[in-house]
């Protein structure tokens, strides 16, 4: 995986230095190579596909041979470019011989050129003779229209059916209405025969040319196959690199301490101009993170961000996060996210989720990443909360890294007093009644139900009555959470102002340095 990440990062540098590499679409050439191995002759289309691979290899060699590339390390990419097979002689021969998928060039052989020259001369003679008939005062009145056309490969003229006996020749076709017959006049019969014979010679010569061109490729089937594989790998590498540039990604550091440290991580499928970055650290001081808070607050987005970025890094992709972000290579990534209720199996939401959890508990190891959305939901709240705690404790003792979202107060309390557990929440702007999507690690989420209801204008008596129904312990916890939340927010604001002041001081220092 380190090799794959190195390839991606070097691909990014290469694109930025030298633009996008000249890699186009290539076909599956397996069947073509089998035909060559059997000494068979390939079609024009097949020859073009193989020519494209040789041409692309030549272009890629040229792309990688720029002098300025020597100033950077491209050791991970160099073997791919160096191993490409180039044969300029074959490419030139093919370019001279083939026009497109349907046409062989006159210059493919001297014989073909001579045949086609004769064909053109005879065609001109035929047309000249037929035009004399079409425009003669004697025969023009017999014609449906003054047109020379072709039927069954032979030049004919359209004659009105009632005058068919007035033109000596052979009828090759009749119009659908029966009002027109297409006649080959005797005067061009021999020329048409001669032209037909030349067409046969042309087809035979083209077949011979295709056989010769196929023969040129026969000794290089292994090289062609290798080229196709190398180009495919390079296409994949530069696809990852292009994606990295588009999302402003960085290369993650890979640690062996089973830790996740994502700095300003962004969900890769959300507009990068709109997504709110989150910094997430797991595995150092705790291995279970419980994210609580209201719906639509961004809990699941955070969950998915952790999973997607971990999977991206393990796949050799750069990640949408700042430099020095670090990820562990997990043996498996498990996720139970969303309502996968099964109608066909008559499973409820709870049963569906629990079926997934059962699979995870039986397959997860200490080196796994486990992501669970709303663990224990869909059943009695008390039972669901206790079951969720027990499952998370099992995963924690297993040693896996776990992130779970939840609404349960019991999980917040448990995480506050249990080693290896940590609370987190997604910040919510009470004034504007909308989530900021900013992750706050160390602070459990608040439902904000009363505050939101009050802001929206619900009668204060109703809110007070609802508040009085909550037990004192829960009220004390919510008050404590509010104090922690307010303190944390104030610290974050001070931190942001300090960082901004520091940046301004650095810029001022640089400005004064340039003035001196």
Question: Which residues make up each language-model segment?
Answer:
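Amphipathic heptad-repeat alpha-helical coiled-coil/stalk segments that mediate oligomerization
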Residues: 1, 55-105, 153-156, 160-165, ...
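Conserved amphipathic alpha-helical "coupling/scaffold" segments
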Residues: 1-111, 115, 220-223, 227-233, ...
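Extended, Lys/Glu-rich alpha-helical coiled-coil stalks
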Residues: 16-23, 47, 207, 214-218, ...
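Active-site phosphate-binding and catalytic loops of NTP-dependent enzymes
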Residues: 37-43, 65-69, 130-146, 239-250, ...
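Extended, charged coiled-coil "arm/hinge" scaffolds of SMC/Rad50-like chromosome-maintenance ATPases
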Residues: 85-100, 190-211
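Extended, Lys/Arg-enriched charged tracts that mediate electrostatic binding to polyanionic substrates
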Residues: 113-163
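ATPase nucleotide-binding head domains, primarily ABC-like/P-loop NTPase cores
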Residues: 247-250, 255-493
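Terminal-proximal interaction/regulatory segments of ATP-powered molecular machines
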Residues: 498-516
